[in-house]
Amino acid sequence: MKVNGIHHVSALTADAQKNLDFYKKVLGLKLVKKSVNQDEPTMYHLFYGDEVANPGTELTFFEIPRIAPFHAGTNSISSIGLRVPGTEALHYWKERFEEQQVTHSGISKRAGRDILAFQDHEGQRLVLTADEEGKGYGLPVKQSGIPEEFSFRGLGPVELTVPYAEPTLHVLTNILGFTEISREPVEGQGTAVILESGEGGAATEIHLIERNDLPRERQGKGSVHHVAFRVRDEEELAGWHRIISREGFSNSGIVERYYFKALYFREPNGILFELSTDGPGFMVDENLDELGQTIALPPYLEHRRAEIEAKLKPIQ
């Protein structure tokens, strides 16, 4: 069995409203679900994605008010990739970032593709990748204020930085079924091992960097919490549960998240991996034109709606 690319990436923010202002209004992503952290429902969990909330397009944020800024280092998910249609789109975004005073590093190359690295208002590290192959899922967001020919298509390569690459590489290749396709220099970072899964292409890639000269990352606002990989359905997820357990990894067991089912475990360098089913998806409780408009709760939290909403600061 092999995973089928990136399902979603989840990160941390200290302010849900400022997060929404940046990711929806500046980047033009669609808020596809305004919900809460199911393990701590007093905090927002915001899901952004493409026009129809396809798996493989979702970038999510847990709000933790007053959380301290992160300190960059190893044992971390060190950047999040977002795919755009091509290099022409990168030039559009470079101009837009300059107009919006977004910190960026200019257009460069990574793993054979043109990229534009940038940071959000909390220092979250992101990379726009020119996806000339176009293998990944993703439909342009309508009414986003961004021309469709330049707009977000979905998640791109996810970068991991670890002090010792070999144990993580073993998990990715020998357990999860990734394939190493090349080793590429990354400016200021040494060499990245480029791995792909599923159908291949930018939407399925992990870039693994070994840095034993850095301290361990301290998580906070601007850091990434976990990366999730796609699996077909609950039956396949049950098979993964058996495999992960057999390999000796402590894990969560299968967790009901309503919009998908999930399995969590930490790889040897401590990075949190999740395996998530493609379905049932984010339209199980809202129509397309309703996505992200109101606070959505899974049925097992619905009886606490009044209590939960009273503790959340309204955002729009």
Swiss-Prot record:
Alphabetically ordered keywords of this record: Aromatic hydrocarbons catabolism, Cytoplasm, Detoxification, Dioxygenase, Iron, Metal-binding, Oxidoreductase, Repeat
Ligand binding (Fe cation): 8, 226, 274
Cysteines engaged in disulfide bonds, as pairs: none
Membrane-spanning intervals of the chain: none
Induction behaviour: Repressed by MhqR. Strongly induced by stress due to exposure to 2-methylhydroquinone (2-MHQ) and less strongly induced after diamide or catechol stress. Not induced by oxidative stress due to hydrogen peroxide or methylglyoxal.
GO MF entries: dioxygenase activity; metal ion binding
Cofactor binding note of this UniProt entry: Binds 1 Fe(2+) ion.
UniProt-recorded name of the protein: Putative ring-cleaving dioxygenase MhqA
Species name: Bacillus subtilis (strain 168)
